């Protein structure tokens, strides 16, 4: 299994496990909603329950909003590009010979050089006329090898699934960091496929070099679920040096994510039937006191995860 696939499997497993724990917490606390609405918060346990429920609802809402934004952005992108679609020139037909891409390449009239793989169940490759005009035949074929890798792996669909979990599980910020590694590693593996198919690094490196001056001008939207040929420093370094990428997870995110899940499990235990055992403890450690620590961890993880989710938006607006 390749590193990107392992990262995706870990991300998916962590996301499903986290979802199960947080869903159990939500179901445990849900019966208190009617009581809170009827009589208000009477003690610290009620306050914690209300705040945790609010965090859960925010996570569900954020995940659904992210999913629908991605779907809507993809639909709008496709609609806009279809209106600019032109016939494939002989240069593209020659470059795609033997790649099993018949009927799956779209060429759009656009002054920005870009290429990307899009759509879910049956992915397609989109090229711009500016890209085709700038690249030599061997460079264009290397780009098609790169995008074909994404197409065969159905990477746009994987991106949608991963981004949904990263947004919905914002109280587990390490999921978002795994998503970032998975996305970059996928690009690196697509590069490696293009290099192998081209018999060397020269063709793909030439294409990336020609795209580099336009890297800041090409934007396909904040949450568009496509796999685009983006030029990044990490990819160029890997292409030149051949050094594998390291999984750079923030220690703070790892600690907060683990703490948040442990805290959620403790809250489930305290509120889900184990509270009788906790009530025998001294007052400092009794049930209301036990709720404060885990809830504080959840809130800290939520703040860190929320900052992770806002980072792409702030970079897009102010970067």
Segments (PLM) and residue ranges:
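Polar-ligand-bearing catalytic/cofactor-coordination segments
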Residues: 1-7, 68-159, 177-249, 307-319
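Hydrophobic or amphipathic, alpha-helical segments that drive membrane association/targeting
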Residues: 1-107, 246-319
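Basic, amphipathic juxtamembrane/active-site segments
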Residues: 158-167
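Substrate-binding clefts and substrate-entry loops adjacent to catalytic sites
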Residues: 171-177
């Amino acid at each position: 299994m390749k590193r990107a696939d392992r990262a995706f499997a870990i991300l998916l497993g962590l996301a499903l496990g986290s979802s199960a724990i947080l869903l159990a917490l939500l179901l445990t606390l849900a019966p208190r909603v009617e009581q809170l609405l009827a009589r208000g918060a009477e003690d610290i346990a009620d306050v914690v329950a209300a705040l945790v429920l609010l965090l859960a609802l925010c996570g569900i809402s954020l995940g659904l909003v992210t999913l629908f934004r991605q779907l809507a952005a993809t639909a709008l992108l496709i609609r806009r590009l279809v209106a600019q679609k032109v016939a494939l020139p002989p240069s593209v037909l020659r470059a795609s010979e033997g790649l099993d891409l018949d009927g799956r390449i779209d060429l759009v009239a656009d002054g920005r050089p870009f290429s990307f793989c899009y759509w879910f169940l049956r992915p397609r490759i989109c090229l711009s006329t500016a890209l085709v005009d700038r690249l030599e035949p061997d460079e264009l074929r290397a780009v098609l090898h790169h995008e074909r890798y994404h197409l065969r792996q159905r990477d746009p669909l994987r991106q949608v699934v991963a981004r949904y979990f990263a947004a919905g599980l914002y109280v587990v910020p390490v999921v978002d960091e795994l998503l970032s590694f998975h996305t970059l590693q996928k690009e690196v593996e697509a590069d490696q496929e293009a290099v192998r198919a081209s018999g060397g690094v020269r063709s793909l490196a030439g294409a990336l070099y020609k795209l580099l001056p336009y890297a800041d001008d090409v934007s396909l939207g904040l949450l568009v679920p496509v796999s685009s040929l983006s030029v990044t420093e990490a990819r160029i370094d890997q292409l030149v040096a051949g050094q594998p990428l390291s999984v750079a997870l923030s220690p703070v995110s790892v600690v907060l994510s683990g703490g948040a899940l442990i805290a959620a499990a403790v809250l489930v235990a305290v509120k889900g039937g184990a509270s009788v055992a906790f009530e025998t403890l001294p007052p400092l450690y009794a049930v209301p006191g036990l709720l404060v620590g885990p809830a504080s961890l959840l809130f800290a993880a939520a703040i860190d995860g929320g900052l992770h989710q806002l980072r792409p938006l702030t970079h897009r607006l102010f970067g």
